[in-house]
């Protein structure tokens, strides 16, 4: 029987039910439920359906004049009635996703302490490092299957937001549910409060976190270790997603734990998976293969290098050598093109640095080889921006790229919109509508010479909910590179432009449930093939995906005792 049709037995009654967001129905409690649970008089007389409630809530949502107020309003619904919240978001996914997540969530993080209203998730502060087990036991969610955790040091492109970074795990888990069908009862946002180096927060009397410079070194590593061990003891089968850790910590944490626990880093691996999926779709639309592309990156941090490594892996899977693939990828950061003779390159950058011998025939470049120098000499067919600095994809650079590439693939992926390397409008006008464009944040369609171009949002929300659903449905013990590659290929298979030759590069958000299920199956199937879970047939895996997919419907309630 469908869980939504099965009654839920509750051992308590009265106002406590109305204060529990996972079970509160508000005005939708039936007459029988109002009597048996002592709710008569606590809600208005009319008994409403969830659609009637959602209609009222949508009218209220539309009455707000700015996105931050809309975000606060939706968060208030989430904190009082989660089923209604997810029905409302599901009904209006394209309109509300930019409100509950990027770009609005960035502003919500900056103003987290000022706008704080009600607790959600767990804050684990360094002074409480010896009581992590107790803190986990205090969680209102007892059967946790997915955790999103941050330390708030690198929130989107906004930098150190301290505990204000909690807005990101809350938002990400909202998308796990609204896009991937993960029951909100199984999700837990966590912020690791290890201090902040943001002077504005340290001096702000309203700041609610630990007022202390960030810890680092061994202290930080030991704190992360204690947290990971405690989570594994409390919820041994939980998927942990690392979110918005600083570059200096993100990759080391991932490398330390990816083979010990079921975990992944969305900024590195999720971003890479959706970028590769989008590139595969763009290549198919352009009638070419990824291993034939020459790719230039602006931004050589952990996210950019993570995407580059995923691209190299996909190129190798298409038949070229690892060495050849790396010659086709150029990484540019603030110091110019990464070269193998540069000092102080980070370990994950060293593998992607170009050999000096590869550029000995280049001409007309400066001491620090700029992106324009790379475009003029390497003649890339793909340009990816993950710099977090607006405006760096200049008209000169885009026109130079278009001069040697009829259909350039250009992905300015930096978030939020204020940090984008170039707007889709500019890119499409500079290329006479020929560029294949995807962005990290949402943009309105662009009209060039009377033709309308829908802008694909190369957003991780197309990937991580499906990965989470696939891990839960299959029971995978780890998230392997092959599972991530499978998610990229599955996303590309859903591209309207690649399938039909028209429409957007990526599916519409209204189709996100079907996309997430398709990705979940691909991810789960690889987990089974790699022996990361118990053997199961394709049919059983598909049934498990459907069985784990939660829908925002009210359940009937029964009393367990009087």
Swiss-Prot record:
PROSITE patterns in the cross-refs: MALIC_ENZYMES
A Pfam family: Malic_M
EC number(s) given by UniProt: 1.1.1.38
GO cellular component annotations of the record: cytosol
The name this protein goes by in its record: NAD-dependent malic enzyme
SUPFAM superfamilies the record matches: Aminoacid dehydrogenase-like, N-terminal domain, NAD(P)-binding Rossmann-fold domains
Similarity field: Belongs to the malic enzymes family.
Record note on cofactor: Divalent metal cations. Prefers magnesium or manganese.
Site positions (Important for activity): 267
Active-site residues from the entry: 101, 172
Binding site for a divalent metal cation: 243-244, 267
Keyword Cytoplasm: no
Cofactor: Mg(2+); Mn(2+)
Binding site for NAD(+): 154, 267, 415
GO molecular function, one term: metal ion binding
Catalytic activity: (S)-malate + NAD(+) = pyruvate + CO2 + NADH; oxaloacetate + H(+) = pyruvate + CO2
